[in-house]
């Protein structure tokens, strides 16, 4: 009906391994969204997340507590968390009752960090699937720490995990390299930043691994993993510094395009702004180059560039 209030809600499912900056991202993104004029509701789906730095609209801890589960069932932290998510999956009426009064808000779901929840366990995927039935359009925002770029073996592992997550979660998906402002603290990059964000020819990573006697033994395995990632050709990354509003804006543009928010009726945009979102302000090369110049010292060379001069 033409005059009916919109019922579709939008949001982000913030996922990623422990320590990748999910909670900090939710805090920074919620502040940025409020500055844009959006009504934001942050939902904590991690029962192990204590001392939340943001105002929490819904907290799964009100339904089930990790400590209580561990004590009652004699489970460890990982097993207890899986039980909590299965319990939430079995009690989605509780979650729906909490979310329904917030209809009209933009949702940020702060999810648990256990990797298996996003790669093969079904509870979280089922929860997201049910939210879609409630007309809640989510984008999965997968954070990984940028320091993995400094180690070829770890970066291949991140690529495989990111690919598995994209295939399993079944949501519109973007991957972020978080903590870009700290990337120099982790060591030199072997290649320019765009090599990692665009996931370019991965054979060069194999050559770096071959120089290590330990990884040389697993060359065939690494070749197959790299081939798998390249065959799907799905994984790419957006660099993020949560303290930089330009960086947050680039991420938000990608999220809005993924879940369709930028073409919705809740936020009126000028034609110029809509075209910017549609065309993507994202000629990624120029934006990534600017980020590299900002966070990597100009005088520094990549490890690959140094090797070529020897």
UniProtKB/Swiss-Prot annotation:
InterPro entries: Gpn (IPR004130), Gpn2 (IPR030231), P-loop_NTPase (IPR027417). The keyword Hydrolase applies. Gene3D superfamilies: P-loop containing nucleotide triphosphate hydrolases. Belongs to the GPN-loop GTPase family. GTP binds at residues 19-24, 178-181. This is GPN-loop GTPase 2. Heterodimers with GPN1 or GPN3. Binds to RNA polymerase II (RNAPII). The modification N-acetylalanine is found at residue 2. Small GTPase required for proper localization of RNA polymerase II and III (RNAPII and RNAPIII). May act at an RNAP assembly step prior to nuclear import. It comes from the Eukaryota. A motif (Gly-Pro-Asn (GPN)-loop) lies at residues 76-78. Keywords: Acetylation, GTP-binding, Hydrolase, Nucleotide-binding. One of its GO terms (molecular function) is GTP binding. The record marks 78 as: Stabilizes the phosphate intermediate. The keyword Acetylation applies.
